[in-house]
From Swiss-Prot:
The keyword Ribonucleoprotein does not apply. SMART domains: WD40 (SM00320). This is Actin-related protein 2/3 complex subunit 1B-B. Gene3D superfamilies: YVTN repeat-like/Quinoprotein amine dehydrogenase (2.130.10.10). Belongs to the WD repeat ARPC1 family. Pfam families: WD40. Component of the Arp2/3 complex, a multiprotein complex that mediates actin polymerization upon stimulation by nucleation-promoting factor (NPF). The Arp2/3 complex mediates the formation of branched actin networks in the cytoplasm, providing the force for cell motility. In addition to its role in the cytoplasmic cytoskeleton, the Arp2/3 complex also promotes actin polymerization in the nucleus, thereby regulating gene transcription and repair of damaged DNA. It comes from the Eukaryota. GO terms for molecular function: actin filament binding. WD repeats lie at residues 6-45, 50-89, 94-135, 140-179, 200-239, 242-280, 321-364. GO terms for biological process: Arp2/3 complex-mediated actin nucleation.
Length: 369
C-alpha cells in the first residue's frame, strides 16, 4: 500500500487519467488540482479555476482525455487539454440547487449530473449548435441525488439519493446512440424509464455501483447496510447490516467481491454468494502497523489541530492508514472484472493505492472470489 498526503484540506472527490499517472482532485474548495507522479513524488502541474462554488464531482474520460466537473454553483464544465492548458466549456444544467455528482458514460458521448433539484441531468454534445445540452430525469426522485454509476451498455444509469432509494433509469438519447439491446433489467428503455427501484432503507444512499457485467448493482446507505440487486435472479435484493460506521463508497473488484469504506477510515471486503443469495463480511483491508511510543513534533501537533480539531496525544491515533473518513474509492487497474489496484481518498487529505495481491498475501484469511 502506498499512502500520500497531498494537503491538510479534505479531498472531497477525485479522478484518474487513463494510465493512472495523473490524479485530479478537489481540496474542499472551488478549484481542482492535478498532480503528476514523478518517481516517488507527486508534483502539481495544473490548477483548474472556473467554478464559483465548491467542486463536488470530478470524472476523467480515459479515451477522449476530457475532464468534467460540477459544483455547488449549479454548473458543470467540460475541460479539454489544448497546448498543455485545460480549457473549460460551460454546460448549462438547468437546475436551481447544487450539483452533487458527475459521471462520464462508458462511450464518453454523454455524462450524467445528480443534483439537489431532485433530478438527473443527462448531458450530450449537439453538433449542429456546437453546444452541450441536457435532458432531465425527474420522476420519481424525491430528494438530492448523491451518487451515480453507468451500466456497461451506455444507457442504463444507477442513482442513489437521500430519499432512501436506489434506482436504475434509462438514459437512452436517440440523437447520439443506437437503440439499446435488451438487458436482464428490462427490454423497453425509453428516456427516463424506471427500470428498478429499491424498497425503502433507513438511510441516505451514499454510493451505487454496477458490476462489470452490469447484471448486479450494489449500494451502501447511512444505516450501515450494503445491498446487492441481481437482475439475473428476478431483481433479488440481498442486504447485510454491517457492524461498522456508515459506509460512504462502494465498488466491485470482481463479479462477486466488493470493497466499501466510510467513516471507519479503512476499506472492507464483502463477498456475494450467488447460489445462496447472501452477502458476507470478507475482512478488513488495512494492516495496522505497530505503533511506537514517541513524542509529537510541533508540526504533527498543528496537523492534528487542523485534521482532527485536537492536539491531545492520548487515544487519538488510528491504526489505519487514513486518519479520517474515506470519501471515495476508484478502480485503478484491472477494471471491475478483476481489479488489481484500487485507490481511496479521504477527509484527511490523503490518497492510498491498494494492491490486491499484496493484501491477499498480507492477510492470510482474505479470500477474493
Amino acid at each position: 500500500m502506498a499512502f500520500h498526503s497531498f494537503l491538510l484540506e479534505p479531498i472531497t472527490c477525485h479522478a484518474w487519467n487513463k494510465d493512472a499517472t495523473q490524479i485530479a482532485f478537489c481540496p474542499n474548495s472551488h478549484d481542482v488540482h492535478i498532480y503528476k507522479k514523478d518517481g516517488v513524488k507527486w508534483t502539481k502541474i495544473h490548477e483548474l479555476k472556473e467554478h464559483n462554488g465548491q467542486v463536488t464531482g470530478i470524472d476523467w474520460a480515459p479515451e477522449s482525455n476530457r475532464i468534467v466537473t460540477c459544483g455547488t454553483d449549479r454548473n458543470a464544465y467540460v475541460w479539454t487539454l489544448r497546448n498543455n492548458v485545460w480549457k473549460p466549456t460551460l454546460v448549462i444544467l438547468r437546475i436551481n440547487r447544487a450539483a452533487r455528482c458527475v459521471k462520464w458514460s462508458p462511450k464518453e458521448n454523454k455524462f450524467a449530473v445528480g443534483s439537489g433539484s431532485r433530478l438527473i441531468s443527462i448531458c450530450y454534445f449537439e453538433q449542429e449548435n456546437d453546444w452541450w445540452v441536457c435532458k432531465h430525469i425527474k420522476k420519481p426522485i424525491r430528494s438530492t441525488v448523491l451518487s451515480l454509476d453507468w451500466h456497461p451498455n451506455n444507457v442504463l444509469l444507477a442513482a442513489g439519493s437521500s430519499d432512501f432509494k436506489s434506482r436504475i433509469f434509462s438514459s437512452y438519447i436517440k440523437e447520439v446512440e443506437e437503440r439499446p439491446a435488451p438487458t436482464p433489467w428490462g427490454s423497453k428503455m425509453p428516456f427516463g424509464e424506471l427500470m428498478f427501484e429499491s424498497s425503502s432503507s433507513c438511510g441516505w444512499v451514499h454510493s451505487v455501483c454496477f458490476s462489470n457485467s452490469g447484471d448486479r448493482m450494489a449500494w451502501v446507505s447511512h444505516d450501515s447496510t450494503i445491498c446487492i440487486a441481481d437482475a439475473t435472479k428476478k431483481m433479488r435484493v440481498t442486504s447485510l447490516i454491517t457492524d461498522t460506521l456508515p459506509l460512504l463508497c462502494v465498488t466491485f473488484i470482481t463479479e462477486n467481491s466488493l470493497v466499501a469504506a466510510g467513516h471507519d477510515c479503512y476499506p472492507v471486503l464483502y463477498t456475494y454468494d450467488e447460489a445462496q443469495g447472501t452477502l458476507s463480511f470478507g475482512g478488513k483491508l488495512d494492516v495496522p502497523k505497530q505503533s511506537s511510543q514517541r513524542g509529537m513534533t510541533a508540526r504533527e501537533r498543528f496537523q492534528n489541530l487542523d485534521k482532527k480539531a485536537s492536539s491531545d496525544t492520548n487515544n487519538i491515533t488510528l491504526d489505519s492508514l487514513h486518519k479520517n473518513s474515506i470519501s471515495q474509492i476508484s478502480v485503478l487497474s484491472g477494471g471491475k472484472a478483476k481489479c488489481s489496484k484500487f485507490c481511496t481518498t479521504g477527509l484527511d487529505g490523503g490518497m492510498c493505492i491498494w494492491d490486491v495481491k499484496s493484501l491477499e498475501s498480507a492477510l492470510k484469511d482474505l479470500k477474493i472470489k
